[in-house]
Regions:
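N-terminal targeting or regulatory segments adjacent to alpha/beta-hydrolase or S9 domains
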Residues: 1-3
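Short loop/turn motifs at secondary-structure junctions and domain boundaries
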Residues: 5-8
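Alpha/beta-hydrolase superfamily serine-hydrolase fold, recognizing
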Residues: 10-207
Length: 207
């Protein structure tokens, strides 16, 4: 395994105006270099768990290894705040950061949206829902093992890898059901939770 050393993470706290109050975020940057690309990162956790603390070591390492500044964005979690609270927060954060890009670096005044698992889902949703002004400022997306569709799509992996993994099929059922709350996949408005079903995939930035 890897035997390297990670320096203690250092970051600056941010508060971003959100649809239901402040959205908390952390910026990992090298203040001696303001011309680095800027990654906006959404943490994973099935839209139910995870926060800024759980992903601080990763975001710090991402900053160190990529040569990019990184803003890690928190968002409201289910069950207290079911869909669409999370994508609403993430889209609002992306808009605000893009509008204030001059305060955070950004080598070409553009951002890269990124995330893992549920966070990758939210990054893709934000890219798909970006208005023209925001879309011009998104240079790309980085999606790490993204959750792109509901379990009712019947993908073979839900059977082939149902057990024996840390993330079992039952966990995925729980995460999706908790996230959607009283909504069902076919309900009006629920489609935005499933980026793989979008008819606008060709509009996504380089991925």
């Amino acid at each position: 395994g890897w035997k390297g050393h990670i320096d203690s993470p250092s970051w600056n706290a941010l508060e971003i105006p959100g649809p239901a109050g402040p959205i908390h975020a952390r910026m990992f940057s090298d203040h001696s270099r303001d011309d680095r690309p800027l990654i906006v990162y959404f943490h994973g956790g099935g839209w139910v768990i995870g926060d800024l603390d759980t992903h601080t070591p990763f975001c710090h390492l991402l900053h160190q290894r990529s040569g990019c500044n990184v803003i890690s964005v928190d968002y409201r979690l289910a069950p207290e705040h079911p869909f669409p609270a999370a994508p609403d927060d993430c889209l609002a954060a992306a808009h605000w950061i893009a509008e204030h890009i001059g305060d955070f670096g950004g080598s070409d005044h553009r951002i890269i949206l990124a995330g893992d698992s549920a966070g990758a889902n939210l990054a893709s949703v934000a890219c798909l829902e970006a208005d023209p002004a925001l879309r011009e400022k998104i240079a790309g997306e980085i999606i790490i093992y993204p959750v792109t569709d509901h379990y009712n799509a019947g993908f073979p992996s839900y059977v082939e890898r149902a057990k024996g993994q840390t993330l079992t099929a039952n966990f995925m059922f729980m995460f999706w059901d908790t996230y959607l709350g009283e909504r069902r996949p076919g309900d009006p408005g629920a489609a935005r939770a499933f980026p793989l079903r979008s008819q606008q995939l060709a509009t996504l930035p380089p991925t």
